[in-house]
């Protein structure tokens, strides 16, 4: 199970919760630093009602500002966000008021599928407060979930590349529910600390942003005002302060897989003759080494339940086809291995015997390692062994420097190795420069002499609402 309840309901008498006595923080007035209310045990049931007494002590985020289609105007529809934490999780209750409740768009559908069709609210948590990477949790008025990782430094396909490229492949463990009423809708969210990575320090601050989209008119608003004149949206977020002694608890997930099969065939007398039974065993494990480092391991993984690839035409193609990664083992921590131009293609590990992966962040250094054995489909061919190292260091407010080293070895004289580096620099408040270089070294005696190649890449972007590139 990857998520809690994701079922909304329609009600004219939905409880909107007790009136909070907590402080209000107006985004439009610049009250963007929020001391986080802490309760011993919230005892909150995620049912889309927010009627527990614990909500009365929550901090309230108010006064959203529109950023689409008109920037800087007060939000046309009011939104209030209540937030608090207890020993094990962070909670949100979001009241999305709407003066045309019949115009609320909401469908009960698949996870991660509604952001282009439904109204929704979105919580963005920058747990390392580094303004580079954040968790995204979105919920529509029916309680359906969308989650992913927000990565600064790439193009999202909007004007001038403004906006985060949200990777919605990762699925996290969290709960949501919602209720639609005659005044709008209410969303409740619970995110356990064990589902998040964050620094191992006694006291910490998190970046926070809450946004809302009204689908019928395309209006988008945010608690912390945002402008396209600044290239990094996470630098425009608010702060949750005073988070003390957060304990993610022990995170250990073990998923054994056992499959069996038995074949039979008709003999010459048209009798069905069964063969001997056969079986296979596999194991997947995820372990939280610390609150900011995760170890994944797999043995003989079974990917039969993974979503099938969309069909592609392979006739008269000069280049190899590209397929997105959907296998769970390779999805954890994918943001660590991302680069301006893709050098890491884990789908080339087609039939893994086993593997291990370590991803996370230590101080200002992002680290990632993948090691795997790839079994040959042909009995006469040797197996392949893959090692991948990646480091990326935060530089300045939004910049970074990184290096990557993928190595694929079949035998001592059969290999492909790549060494690459990348940099992202933010100049002033509007310009972003991205640089990347890599060298490839291959040897295969069956095809002749060793080969090598190089690539260089650069990009400059200007953020702006009226002029961008």
Where does each model-flagged region fall?
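Structural preference for beta-rich elements and adjacent junctions enriched in aromatics
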Residues: 1-394, 399-402, 413
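Transmembrane beta-barrel architecture of outer membranes
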Residues: 276-284, 351-355, 382-390, 398-406, ...
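C-terminal, active-site-flanking charged/polar segments
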Residues: 211-215, 459-465
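Short strand-coil-strand connectors
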Residues: 361-363, 428, 463
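Long, charged, mostly alpha-helical binding arms that flank functional sites
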Residues: 410
């Amino acid at each position: 199970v990857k998520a809690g309840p994701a079922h909304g309901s329609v009600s004219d008498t939905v409880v909107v919760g007790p009136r909070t006595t907590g402080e209000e923080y107006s985004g439009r007035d610049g009250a963007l630093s929020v001391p986080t209310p802490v309760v011993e045990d919230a005892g909150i049931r995620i049912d889309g009602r927010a009627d527990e007494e614990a909500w009365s002590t929550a901090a309230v985020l108010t006064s959203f500002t529109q950023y689409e289609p008109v920037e800087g105007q007060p939000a046309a529809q009011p939104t209030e966000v209540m937030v608090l934490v207890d020993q094990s999780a962070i909670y949100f209750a979001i009241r999305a008021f709407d003066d045309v409740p019949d115009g609320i768009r909401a469908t009960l559908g698949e996870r991660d599928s509604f952001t282009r069709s439904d109204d929704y609210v979105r919580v963005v948590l920058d747990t390392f407060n580094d303004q580079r990477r954040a968790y995204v949790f979105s919920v529509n008025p029916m309680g359906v979930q969308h989650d992913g990782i927000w990565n600064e430094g790439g193009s999202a396909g909007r004007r001038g590349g403004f906006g985060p490229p949200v990777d919605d492949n990762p699925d996290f463990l969290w709960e949501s529910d919602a209720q639609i009423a005659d005044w709008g809708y209410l969303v409740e969210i619970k995110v356990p600390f064990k589902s998040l990575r964050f620094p191992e320090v006694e006291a910490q601050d998190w970046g926070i942003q809450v946004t809302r989209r009204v689908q019928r008119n395309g209006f988008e608003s945010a608690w912390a005002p945002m402008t396209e004149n600044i290239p990094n949206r996470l630098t425009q977020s608010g702060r949750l302060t005073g988070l003390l002694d957060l304990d993610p608890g022990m995170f250990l997930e073990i998923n054994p897989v056992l499959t069996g099969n038995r074949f039979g065939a008709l003999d010459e007398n048209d009798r069905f003759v069964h063969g001997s039974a056969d079986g296979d065993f596999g194991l997947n494990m995820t372990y939280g080494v610390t609150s900011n480092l995760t170890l994944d391991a797999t043995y003989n993984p079974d990917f039969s339940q993974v979503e099938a690839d969309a069909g592609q035409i392979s006739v008269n193609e000069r280049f190899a086809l590209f397929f997105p990664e959907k296998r769970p083992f390779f999805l954890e921590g994918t943001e660590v291995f991302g680069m301006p131009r893709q050098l890491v293609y884990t789908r080339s590990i087609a039939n893994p015997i086993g593997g291990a992966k370590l991803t996370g962040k230590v101080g200002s250094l992002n680290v990632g390692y993948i090691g795997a054995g790839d079994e040959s489909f042909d009995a006469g061919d040797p197996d392949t062994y893959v090692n991948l190292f990646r480091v990326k260091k935060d530089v300045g407010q939004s910049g970074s420097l990184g290096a990557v080293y993928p190595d694929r070895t079949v035998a001592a004289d059969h290999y492909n190795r790549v060494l690459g580096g990348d940099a992202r620099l933010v100049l002033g408040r509007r310009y972003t420069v991205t640089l990347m270089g890599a060298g490839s070294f291959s040897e295969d005696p069956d095809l002749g002499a060793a080969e090598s190649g190089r690539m260089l890449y650069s990009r400059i972007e200007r953020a702006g609402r009226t002029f961008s590139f």
